[in-house]
Amino acid sequence: MRYKKIHFAFDKKNDLILQKFKLFKKFKKYSPRNSDLIVVLGGDGFMLEMLKKFKKFNKPFYGMNAGTYGFLMNKLKNNNLLVNFSKSKIVTISPLQMIAKTKSNIVKKEIAINEISILRQGKQTASLQIKKGKKTIMKKLVSDGALVSTPAGSTAYNLSVHGPILSLNSKKLAITPISPFRPRRWRGSVVSDRSTISITNLDTRKRPVSIVADNVEFRNIKNVKIFVNRKIKFNLLYDSKNSLNKKIKIEQVRKEIS
């Protein structure tokens, strides 16, 4: 597909982007609403912000990396941009949806492209119960927390806490403990992406926890339900030689070797 109306969203805090942005000034400016493609210049964190910020416009996104790793991004290129955009392949992903309730019974809702993490809020470990539907997966997990990861996010925080890498087409979610103390050997669980996962804080008074959806945090959480929201779809564009699925496979090989 040929993309002509481009909206550029760039991280103004990124020095590399500020240096390179003059290369994109030749393009006519379009608002996100009137564009047919949103190009995001920055790192993974900025990409996640822009996906959420502009999701209401239902436009495809093409990320160009100026961050540290840029797993969700393409390489930052200067030449033949319109050709690169038109030749790129679309990957469609749906985010996780969290519906959490605080200790004060206030409902908090947020989506996450990578993962939703429940984390201890103070010096004491968290005490969590985890269910898949009505089935109890873990009656009591004493740990620094737990997370639920999508395939797209499985090589991020999930991998750093020894969670499994999921193929993009696996139709699975990873439930991964963070520094588990009891049971010490529990490595988590891989479940269908049709599952609804419930996590309850068993001791809100002595062991408060927060919840983080990608980069959005809520504190003093009592319980949360997490599921894939299929009503929301993000279309991400990737260069044919730099596909998201290829990146995930590379990480799988690295994990097997290490």
Residues of each region from the PLM?
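Solvent-exposed alpha-helices and their adjacent loops that cap or buttress functional pockets
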Residues: 30-33, 90, 109-110, 120-123, ...
